[in-house]
Every structure is written in structure tokens, then in C-alpha cells.
């Protein structure tokens, strides 16, 4: 079953958790195994925190076992574009100019919301420096590649987010879009992306 879990949508995972046909721990283990297998070629992640992810998944599993899920995403693995503050992890925005020592003590609002709903935040995805271009390379992390053709770009600036989803390294990712930074990589990798409205 664990191999099959990487092909499930967030909605399908929630149904499996509710019916006790799979657990959040099984889901995140499947994703982490997939990242280990695929990301050495794709380079979608700047950070993956296995220990934190498993701890979050165990907490989620306990809530599901008690019939008390925390919110709309409880137990669903999600990655965060490295432009958004994420408590406990550096946010480097693809740049060598930001000191990774931190302190990193708060979540961006979008990260806080998915955390409040029980999502299992497992890693941060790559982006070009400060999101200034529509491809996925920077001096900090190197080149992020399109999973469908490693000689091609996944687009940008949410390069790692789109590449991760296309390669089944998690069902959900938070990206950011001011001028195409979700829409471009979504179109380049064949995944579904939403640019939220302002306000």
C-alpha cells in the first residue's frame, strides 16, 4: 500500500485516514521514500526534515485514532516554497545573502493556516534567488529539473514546488505567484496550480 500512497490526492488520503485504510505515518513515509529516490536527480528540495515530519504524522495518527482530526488537512504531507517563513527552518529565498542561522521563530500566514489544519509539513522547495525569474536555478541550490525531462526546466519561480508534485514527492505544495510563479511551473510540469486572489 505504501507505494500506492504517493499516487493519492490529498482528498483521497483524507478518505483513507477516515476509513482507517492508511495512516498519516504510512503516507509521510511513502513521500519521504519517494523524495530519497527521485530528488537526487530533480533537486526540488532545499530542506527535508524527516524527524519533524514523522513526529507530526504520529500526532495526526493519534488524532485520527481518537476520531478527532485537527482540521481539513490532518495528516496530509505538504511542502513549502522557500520564500515563506516556516518556524524552526531557515527561509533563504534561494539566496546566499540570507544568514541561515536565524532565528526562525514564526510561520508565514499560509504556513500557519495549513499547520492549524494538521498538515504534515515535511520540507522546503527550491526557487530562483528572490523569485526573480521564471526558471528554477540559483547559486544556493543549483538547477531544479523537470521530472518529465531532466534536460528541461520546471519553470519558476515555484520550481521545486511544481517539480515535487509532478514527481509524486507529496500531494500538496505551497508556492507563491506575483507574475506567473505558480502558473508557469504548473504549465511546464502538468500539475494543477492555483494563484489565489489578493485581499
Could you tell me what each predicted segment is?
Residues 13-17, 57-60, 161:
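Generic hydrophobic alpha-helical segments
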Residues 51-58, 118-119, 128:
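Long amphipathic alpha-helix in the N-terminal Rossmann-like dinucleotide-binding domain
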Residues 104-199:
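Short glycine/serine-rich loop segments
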Residues 72-110:
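Enzymes and membrane/adaptor proteins characterized by extended Gly/Ser/Thr/Asp/Glu-rich
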Residues 31, 53, 75, 81, ...:
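Conserved hydrophobic/aromatic pocket- or pore-lining residues that grip, position, or stack substrates
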Residues 60-77:
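Immediate post-signal peptide segment of exported/extracytoplasmic ligand-binding proteins
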Residues 1-49:
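An N-terminal boundary/leader segment
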